[in-house]
Regions:
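N-terminal core-binding DNA-recognition domain of tyrosine recombinases/integrases
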Residues: 6-21, 27-103
Length: 103
């Protein structure tokens, strides 16, 4: 997993006191995000992904027959990660913001 994602998870654990189950779910979702970044460009990182690339990643999850609730949870984790990056000044805008969760 990319070090920046590990930092995010560490802050979730310490500052928000997230439960082990929450952290496990976020870790899986951020692992998917990291894999998506590596598929786009080798040695890339999740903070470099665009809205279009994230949308493709969600479509891949749908094609893998993930339940809509699982895809929505994944998108929620991605959004939280990008909000965190924006607050830190690591990105100019949140590429996950315009994405809609499946119903």
């Amino acid at each position: 997993m990319h070090p920046i994602a590990e930092q995010f998870l560490s802050e979730l654990a310490i500052q928000r006191r997230a439960s082990r189950h929450t952290l496990d779910a976020y870790r899986r979702d951020l692992f998917r995000l990291n894999q998506l970044a590596l598929e786009v460009t080798p040695n890339s990182s999740p903070d470099k992904l665009t809205t279009t690339q994230l949308r493709r990643g969600l479509m891949q999850l749908h094609a893998q027959n993930l339940a809509p609730r699982s895809i929505a949870r994944t998108l929620s984790a991605w959004r939280s990660f990008y909000v965190w990056l924006a607050r830190r000044g690591a990105i100019a805008h949140n590429p996950a913001e315009p994405l809609k969760a499946p119903k």
